[in-house]
Amino acid sequence: MKQDYVRFFEQPRNPLPGGILFEALRPYRNIILAVNPRVTIEVIEGILKACKDTGQIVIMELALSEMSLKGGYTGLTPSSFAERVKHAAEKVGWYGYVLHADHMTVKKGDEDELKNLERELDARIEAGFTSFAIDSSFLFNREAHSVEDQLKDIIENSIYLHKYIMDKLNDFPYGREGEVGEIGIKEFTEVAEALHYVRELKKSGIDIHFLAIANGTKHGVSVDSEGNIVPQLGINIKRTVEIADALQAEGFRTRIVQHGITGTPLHLIAEKFPKGRILKGNVGTFWMLLVWDILRIFEPELYWKINHWVIENYRKGDELEVETFNKYSKYAIKHFFNEFEKISEETKLAIKSKAYAEALTFFKAFGMEETAKKVYKYIQENKIKY
């Protein structure tokens, strides 16, 4: 006999509000998997099936660069991505997912950019997104000498855009994510920077659930001369814990979101990552590389078309072809969009199966246990409808 929470998330429903997920998981003891499924619906289906079979909630997300009103580099708009995830949920019979707008990035902070971001946010709200990340970390002022001045533009733009969302969604319990340290830079976010950022947003009535910091990881992967992924071991766990503990000591419930997990050995995550302090783990490039690996075996003609297109358009100087491909193949997704829709049923099954198995491994390494059951319990106890 099925448990109540299973029946609940098997029933067609809207994406789970991110704020409900954040509240329901207290006390925090795990990391929630957040997936950027850039290529093919089968990746989403495989992951959702793994969620259904193990009772998990997952976050499905794409960044502004990946998905936009113009299609980003995946060819997906906010509405088409939302529909893709919904269609996968219908096929699998599992609606335990948050729909997250990742990296709504501010690079200049001028009027034109902010107006465009408002249009992009409107599109995501209309498409039913239930969580939003404002990333103005590029505006860090390296010429300034005080934390207040260094973060001034970051904070002002974060507040402006978070308030824009709040005005649109009112009391809807959406997820809120901020970013104080640009992912991939050499400097580590200071404890004082994280505290100042969260304090200032709080003063403006914005409680951030997740905070992204610069702690030594980067987006994507690095490869050696043979094309093997070089393990990413640069995360500064000590600084991450210091920031999380400092936030908690001041009474903030904000937890860390870890970007740039692809390339980090899963055993390191399982054994060393401070679960609960890091509450959200973003995995994007990993799933794209998974699809390339399957295509190389099951659809070699398509794989080599993609490979040659990437090398021809993006290789610089004597850069290794494998390095060029790993770095720039994401730009092939939009170019070959229609061809991904024509892959064989055998290939689709392979992608789903591989995504399913890998998702199970991430769940285990992240310490995820019965997250759907916990969320269901919270929803029932608080008589929440969404």
What do these predicted regions represent?
Residues 289-342:
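C-terminal hydrophobic structural anchor segments
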Residues 18-24, 41, 45-59, 63-66, ...:
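Alpha/beta enzyme core
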Residues 2-15, 29-94, 99-102:
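Metallocofactor- and cofactor-centric catalytic cores in central/energy metabolism, strongly enriched
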